[in-house]
Amino acid sequence: LWELTKRAKEAVLPQVYIEDLREELKAGNRSMFSRRLKELIKDRLNKGEQIMLFLNRRGYAGFVSCRSCGHVMECPHCDISMTYHRDGRLRCHYCGYEQPMLKVCPECGSPYIGTFGLGTQKVEAALYKEFPQAKVLRMDMDTTKRKNSHEQILSAFSDGEADILVGTQMIVKGHDFANVTLVGVLAADLSLHANDYRAGERTFQLSLIHI
């Protein structure tokens, strides 16, 4: 058995922090960003260094539910929860079906419909609110539909046209940005609940790529 006991070219392992947002909530922090992450982002922005934030879910909110009866809005074709996007539409990320955001619950007629969870769109909006001076790029399926848009976003970030790059797993593989000194994996345990017996392994792989 051959073991890798050190990194290639004697590369230094980065400092890794794991934050429990349940403890953050108890401390009064209701943000999607831990207090440590916010301080680290501020530090990098002040130094002129770049940041990458990874969340493996696009859209604005992970699902839409009725606050009265608990009904979750699902795709009529796939029977999975639909994702809310900032353009006011619900989309199925499996088959592509979409519809306008509902005003009343189809099960009980209640007008109390809420969005829950988070996606890359919500992260982008939160960054602009928390760090208004920062320039943010978002890279996911929604921002890379046009020809060459994938390369344009990466090139712009590499050239220093943005301080923070937010994206799904397409931002984590095969990229090397010299000025990136901070990487945040948001809701790192999200993929543990995927319908996949290798969910734990895949979650570890995605997290390890950043390190």
Describe the predicted segments one by one.
Residues L1-L208:
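Inter-lobe coupling/hinge segments of SF2-like helicase ATPases
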